[in-house]
Amino acid sequence: AVLPDSPAEPLPIAARLVKLRAMRGLMMDSPLLISSLLRHAARVYADQTLVSRTVEGPIHRTSYRELHERSQRLAQALLALGVRPGDRVATLAWNGYRHVETYFAVSGIGAVCHTLNPRLFFDQLLYILQHAEDVLLLVDLTFLPLAEKLAPRCPGLRGVVVMTDRAHLPEHALPGLHVYEELLAAQPGGYAWPSFDEHTASSLCYTSGTTGDPKGVLYTHRSTVLHSFAISLPDVFSLSERETVLPVVPMFHVNAWGLPYAAALTGTRLVLPGARLDGESLYRLFEDERVTMTAGVPTVWMGLLAYLKQTGQRFTTLKRVVIGGSAAPEAMIRAFQDDYGVEVLHAWGMTETSPLGTACRLTPAMQTWPEDQQLAVQRKQGRPVFGVELRIVDDEGRELPHDGAAAGDLQVRGPWIASGYYKLDGSNAHHDGWFSTGDVSTIDPLGYMQITDRSKDVIKSGGEWISSIALENLAVGVPGIAEAAVIAAAHPKWTERPLLLLVKAPGAEVDARAVLDHIAQHVARWWVPDAAVFVDGLPHTATGKISKLQLRERFKDYRLPDTE
């Protein structure tokens, strides 16, 4: 804005802000709260349906009106259990209607909804629960055995709620266990959602701990509502009450990429797949519920495409598939678009970006380009959505040109980008107000970003991160192993799998199987490397670090045993 008395030389930002504050607009100061999304859905889209494949088995159908009423009862139940504003309430659950109710009820009372990723190994989950100081844990039936192991080791946990009814409750070893449906039935309903500062913490997700302990990212009501608006835009997910969306991405993965919130905002019909994510189960749900859009990681789509190829089935209603979590292979894009007539939307984000940062849609001019040129664009992660700014910088922090050739550290900022980590002061991931993603990227003149490498050498297998450092540390803990390095090897299904490279100590007698068995005792099964190879030595940089760059080049054509 230019003020009438502006000097010839621009004022410093602080001085300009002081002048701009001299005149305030006359708009109501209504806070952007997550409860307002659900209240809006219940009033405007009351009869829109939400469909869930439940853990118990049957398909469950509800409406936004009923979802709102049950969320109000859950809010009252949480308060009756002693949950207070600011408390963290954890979930271990699949995509289902009770999990959606928990999203809205926990945040709606001013507490923090903390989704736990059950695919992490036990020690990580225990660390996260203890670090977050969760006061309550809500679990699907699937994860009740896991909760029985975790709860006794978390003294701050006041109780566990099983998200089922009494008829489906199995035998268990947890004292004072609460049954979800009984908690709701005991409440009168009609809860009035409180109003509070929109900057209040609303939800908490932890990173996968690829460079050490997992780190907590604490979202706010404001950031969540703004993110919901952004992902609903026509050139992003294009959500409306005319769409039926099935989020395959789990609700424990950065809030299912924000889709449950955005669906309430736009009245989108939501279909939730539960625990069954195989190709046949997903296809049947797509067809039975006439799904028009879906979102998930490449590994899931590989299984779905394989099922379609084997059976000759085709989609009758699916129009768009969002692929994120890791890069979409060109063959996958071609298969969806050429073989099945489904548009592919390539997207990028991370836990720290809520998660959506970019979406890749072709411009009108690109629609006339040759197919190969269009695919070259679609392989990119796309352009930033409104609210997100991107830049790339060199090692000295100098901004690099957006010419599609210069590659540098990708940095991002915006209203739903993390400014720090929960209980972690002095994060070195932020530079002059920008968050460093750890990705090496290019940005072309049209604003399309493409990730070319990952600076921290993590392995992304089926959309899940695996820490090379953690595996290396375990390997060198085996007697007789002098040095170890883990790099990514290409895999046709999982995109990447860990390959373990080992150097024996002089005179040592140790076999690869013993090393892998040792690792398997300490990490989740899917973290265990697919192969271990002994080498005479590992290359090092001038500073004494193992050169992963040289190792990747040396083993770029390596074929894992089960992919021969």
Walk through the language-model features, giving the residues of each:
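Structural core segment of the AMP-binding/adenylate-forming
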Residues: 6-11, 37-38, 80-81, 108-182, ...
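AMP-dependent adenylate-forming
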Residues: 37-62, 168
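Conserved AMP-binding/adenylate-forming core of the ANL superfamily
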Residues: 50-96, 100-104, 121-126, 179-182
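Conserved adenylate-forming
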Residues: 78-84, 187-200, 204-246, 258, ...
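Conserved AMP-binding/adenylation subdomain of ANL enzymes
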Residues: 109, 225-244, 254-292, 307
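AMP-binding/adenylate-forming catalytic core of the ANL superfamily
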Residues: 120, 126, 137-141, 294, ...
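Gly/Ser/Thr-rich phosphate-binding loop
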Residues: 265, 288-296, 305-376, 389, ...
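Conserved beta-loop-beta connector loops within the AMP-binding
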Residues: 384-411, 445-446, 508-512, 547
